[in-house]
């Protein structure tokens, strides 16, 4: 089953109007898991690519029923959205000083009420004992392999 998250094309809008990299989208994932189980799924393995790793990791952090999922597969996942913003910003605007991205993050927190700290899922993933397959190439321009290395260690 492939699901879409709130704020996606044709999907329900989050009250914020923004895709929050799992902070709210994990609820959509939980609904999809329940749907699969109610319709006969014997095992549930979640697969998240890039930003799709956020909702999975947020689900780990927020669920009261971790036993519903039998495994996770991640490909170049975003487990820390602040780092993703900085890396993507530097890739798209290499002439800007790196410190300016901290200002943009701070401004987004104030202007849009985004809680970037709530989108740091690294410890939740590290402390979860569900089987996980994590792979990530070292030429990824958007998600640094060091973020996956941190999880793997």
Residue positions per predicted region:
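Conserved alpha/beta-hydrolase
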Residues: 1-13
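Alpha/beta-hydrolase active-site loop
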Residues: 16-39
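Short beta-strand immediately N-terminal to the catalytic nucleophile in serine-hydrolase-like folds
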Residues: 43-48, 75, 135
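Gly/Ala-rich beta-loop-alpha elbow adjacent to hydrolase catalytic centers
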Residues: 47-56
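Hydrolase active-site cap/lid region
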Residues: 58-115
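Short beta-strand/loop motif that positions the catalytic acidic residue
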Residues: 127-129, 134-136, 140
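Conserved alpha/beta-hydrolase "acid-adjacent" motif
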Residues: 141-147
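Catalytic histidine neighborhood in serine/cysteine hydrolases
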Residues: 152-153
């Amino acid at each position: 089953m492939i699901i879409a998250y709130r704020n996606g094309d044709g999907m329900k809008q989050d009250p914020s109007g923004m895709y929050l990299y799992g902070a709210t989208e994990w609820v959509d994932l939980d609904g999809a898991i329940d749907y699969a189980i109610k319709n006969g799924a014997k095992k549930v393995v979640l697969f998240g690519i890039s930003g799709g790793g956020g909702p999975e990791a947020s689900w780990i952090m927020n669920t009261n029923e971790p036993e519903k999922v039998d495994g996770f597969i991640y490909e170049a996942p975003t487990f820390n959205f602040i780092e993703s913003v900085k890396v993507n910003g530097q890739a798209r605007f290499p002439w800007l000083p790196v410190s300016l991205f901290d200002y943009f993050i701070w401004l987004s927190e104030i202007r849009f009420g985004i809680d970037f700290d709530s989108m740091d899922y690294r410890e939740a993933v590290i402390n979860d004992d569900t089987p996980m397959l994590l792979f990530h190439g070292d030429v990824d321009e958007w998600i640094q392999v060091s973020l996956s290395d941190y999880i793997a260690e």
